[in-house]
Design a protein with these regions (language model features):
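Conserved alpha-helix/loop element of class I SAM-dependent methyltransferases that forms part
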Residues: 34-40, 45-66
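A short acidic, Gly/Pro-enriched loop at the edge of an enzyme's catalytic core
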Residues: 126-137
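A short glycine-rich, Lys/Arg-flanked "PGG" loop and its adjoining helix->strand segment in the class I
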Residues: 151-166
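Class I SAM-dependent methyltransferase SAM/SAH-binding core
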Residues: 69-73, 77-127
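Substrate-binding/catalytic lobe of Class I Rossmann-like enzymes that use SAM or dcSAM, i.e.
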Residues: 187-245, 251-271, 279-280
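N-terminal auxiliary segments of SAM/dcSAM-dependent transferases
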Residues: 1-27
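A short SAM/SAH-binding and catalytic strip from SAM-dependent methyltransferases
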Residues: 137-148
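Short, glycine-/aromatic-enriched active-site segment of Class I SAM-dependent methyltransferases
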Residues: 172-193
Length: 280
């Protein structure tokens, strides 16, 4: 990993996602599904189905079932955890830096009206409010890269997992250390992201923390397809948005989606899925 020209803090990340929370809901997904999709092919443009497929693949790879106690680290608006609890009957906790997204997740949970055993908490994954050896599973989707202290994040995940517990997650990747000015502006600085792991670097870091690697997938085509589809969605949304400030933000995001595709082609941005186990 390399250090960005500007060192963003957790407070910077929290502020960004609090401030942009409603805008993301307005043009991306009203229910807060805001992660990378697992598409069937280059002609597949069904984002919601692809996003659901990502969640289903992680749940299956992680072996989540009705006996699981799941922590969603960086849960955002909460749809993944609610979906897991609804489908599998598992118990769950969601933790996120953004108070706006946690409040939204709580409202979504109340609206689910299904007696789900799920709780959402505002807090940092670098100082989790849970006892050692609590969870059978820790999951996450495209969130942990944003935490500046990645070593502390992984050690906290390791701490709260039970022996034999599973860490199943997807995350953005930084395939190479040197990032162009365009890539830094449109991919990294845009969401207050300092730096990330490469595909192999992520696995090495997990092993160094004490995990055993179970599975890893390098999914470059999936993230490129996601931003192609989301960019098209954003452009369409901007065309029917009257509020000029919001419209300008959405159009800037749509432009960034195109830049993200170029950054992927330059080898500056990637995406992967990882399954790791805490030794029994």
């Amino acid at each position: 990993m390399t250090t960005a020209r500007q060192a963003f803090t957790e407070q910077d990340v929290e502020g960004f996602f609090d401030q942009t929370h409603q805008t993301y809901l307005d043009f991306w997904d009203a229910e807060g599904v805001l992660h990378t999709g697992y598409f069937l092919g280059l002609d597949d443009d069904d984002y919601r189905a692809a996003a659901q497929r990502t969640s289903d693949v992680l749940a299956a790879d992680g072996g989540i079932d009705g006996s699981s106690y799941v922590l969603d680290a960086g849960c955002g608006c909460g749809p993944f955890l609610i979906d897991l609890a609804r489908k599998h009957g598992c118990k769950g906790e969601g933790l996120d830096l953004s108070s706006e997204r946690i409040n939204f997740a709580r409202k979504q949970l109340a609206g689910a009206n299904a007696g789900l055993d799920v709780t959402f908490t505002h807090g940092s994954v670098t100082a989790m409010p849970y006892e050692d050896n609590t969870f059978s599973h820790v999951v996450s989707q495209d969130a942990l890269c944003l935490v500046p202290d990645k070593a502390k994040t992984q050690s906290e995940v390791f701490r709260v997992l039970k022996p034999g517990g599973i860490f199943a997650f997807s995350d953005f990747l930084q395939p190479k250390p040197d990032i162009s000015e365009r890539g830094r502006t449109h991919v990294y600085d845009r969401v207050r992201w300092n730096s990330g792991f490469s595909y192999l670097g992520y696995q090495q870091s997990l092993i160094h923390t004490g995990f055993e690697m179970v599975l890893a997938r390098n999914l470059l085509t999936q993230i490129r397809q996601t931003y192609r589809v989301i960019g098209t969605m954003a452009t369409a949304r901007a065309a029917v948005t009257d509020n000029q400030v919001e419209k300008d933000w959405i159009l800037a995001f749509a432009e960034s989606c195109g830049e993200i595709e170029l950054a992927i082609d330059r080898g500056e941005f990637g995406w992967g899925m990882f399954i790791a186990r805490k030794p029994a």
